[in-house]
Amino acid sequence: MYPKILTLIVVSILLTNSRSVMSQNQPNFPDYGNPIRLEVAKKIILKAEAEAKKNGWKMVISIVDSGGNLVYLERIDGTQFGSIDISQGKAKCAVNFRRPTKAMEDSVVAGGMGLRLIGLPGVYPLEGGELILLDGKIIGAIGVSGGTSAQDGQVARAGLEGLKD
């Protein structure tokens, strides 16, 4: 008797969860555009580096194009070597999934279904990866590593100010 009731409860829960997952609407993500140009990447890096240095943070800043290929990388003297791969990973993650890495971090922190992101290849669920948009299209992304997640995000967003120059 109890195994049948338990089976019924489990099946009901699974059906309820699958319906709610399937009914979720896919967000509107920006389309990919032409790859970022080197001179634009350099302007973004300069703004990001200035923000990091202003705060005394040692960081690595990476720019990738709309295909996730490295365009430019800056490592502030004394930054840990591990941040090189992490900054590139954050930038690639932002481009590949067409969203800031903070969105991934928030999903993982919320738990539940968001935890499955941890097992996906190329996901860096840490703040510090931001899309670089031009005319509403993704031309690349910036990835920053070396500080706390919030510091990495602050420097990445400061770098985006380089688009305005």
Q: Locations of the language-model features?
A:
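Flexible, solvent-exposed loop/hinge segments and secondary-structure transition points
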Residues: 22-165
